[in-house]
């Protein structure tokens, strides 16, 4: 038995977390474990991990010395445009094109919102962000209805999204790495320990090129 409280960012809600948790619960020793789920932005999740309300968090990287961060899946950043759009014929779109069209962005408080701003500074892009959204579903919906274009990770939301074009970023490979994090010096129930170790083995199975991806990404980590 045991109880595990986890928090995770919105892009992991559609498939990643439900799928991983179900596989964990299907193991004989875990069948009586109870999960509580909570969705939010990375900083809010980290705060609840720190107070002990959550055992484990899943989100972006934060510079926190009292927490352990373990890299899990990595998603390439892409530009999405509406079906009928001047860029629609281009397979790859330069990042600078974000300067020339209205942009649908992330809420500033979210990890992805902060990361996007960092990337804009790094690559000297100055987009006109007309609206900030809490999650990828909202971004895709607004792009589909021709309110603007967007920079976002290639999540499973995009696999089933119609009415939009997905473009690689020309000449750049930028990734959003998802991390699992927990408090370093805190007692954890055996079920929580098993779940952390299970997720680490899942990462190894999912890896493919994740190791290389992490290296590309980790150069970009900044202290927000």
Where do the model's predicted regions map?
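Flexible hinge/capping segments at coil-to-helix
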Residues: 67-103
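Paired acidic/hydrophobic, glycine-rich loop segments that form the ligand-binding mouth/hinge
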Residues: 7, 55-59, 79, 148-153
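Secondary-structure junction motif
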Residues: 102-123, 188-196, 203-214
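A late-sequence structural motif
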Residues: 16, 167-209
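Beta-alpha-beta core module
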Residues: 65-71, 75-76, 90, 137-185
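Hydrophobic hinge/microswitch elements
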Residues: 41-45, 50-53, 109-167
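Central regulatory/effector-binding core of bacterial HTH transcription factors
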Residues: 2-64, 132-133
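N-terminal hydrophobic or amphipathic helices and topogenic motifs
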Residues: 1-15, 19, 26, 193, ...
């Amino acid at each position: 038995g045991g109880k595990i409280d986890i928090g995770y960012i919105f892009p992991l809600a559609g498939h990643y977390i439900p799928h991983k948790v179900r596989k964990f619960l299907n193991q004989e020793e875990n069948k009586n474990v109870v999960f509580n789920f909570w969705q939010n932005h990375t900083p809010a999740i980290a705060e609840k991990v720190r107070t002990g309300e959550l055992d484990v968090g899943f989100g972006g990287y934060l510079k926190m010395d009292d927490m352990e961060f373990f890299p899990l899946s990595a998603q390439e950043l892409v530009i999405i445009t509406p079906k009928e759009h001047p860029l629609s014929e281009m397979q790859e779109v330069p990042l600078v094109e974000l300067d020339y069209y209205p942009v649908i962005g992330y809420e500033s408080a979210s990890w992805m919102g902060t990361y996007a701003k960092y990337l804009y500074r790094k690559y000297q892009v100055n987009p006109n962000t007309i609206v900030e959204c809490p999650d990828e579903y909202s971004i895709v919906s607004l792009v589909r209805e021709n309110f603007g274009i967007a920079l976002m990770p290639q999540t499973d939301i995009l696999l089933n999204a119609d009415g939009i074009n997905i473009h690689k970023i020309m000449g750049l490979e930028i990734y959003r790495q998802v991390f699992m994090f927990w408090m370093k010096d805190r007692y954890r129930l055996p079920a929580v320990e098993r779940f952390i170790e299970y997720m680490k083995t899942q990462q190894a199975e999912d890896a493919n090129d994740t190791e290389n991806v992490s290296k590309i990404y980790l150069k970009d980590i900044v202290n927000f």
